[in-house]
Amino acid sequence: MDKFDRQILEILQKDCTQSVSDVAQQVGLSTTPCWRRIQAMEKSGVIKGRVALSDPEKLNVGLTVFVIIRTNQHNPEWLESFAEVAQDFPEIIEFYRMSGDVDYLLKVVVPDMKAYDVFYKKLINRASF
């Protein structure tokens, strides 16, 4: 990757809906070489896809909460069981295994604190920590 590729990536990460000719103009290339660079980055996996960013407030999930999970069960069966429980909660959008004092970290999105309380009670009812 050279400076043109990095510039193209930076532009596309800010707004991937721009035309190739607009991107080319911004980086100082003609359209065809810019298009070839984008195609090469897609083919090599540097560019995995193009996404639309949503507004959490408009989707009624304006509160993001990070939930720390500690457990004394460190076996594959427990992890599989907990992962199945977590999949039943659309509020959990990310799930990480950690190191140190924290075993797992959940990223949860809900409309407000009241909704988080409801989520939390449902989670502790279903999971065994």
Tell where the protein language model's regions lie, with residue ranges.
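A compositional/biophysical signature of low hydrophobicity enriched in polar/charged and small residues
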Residues: 1-129
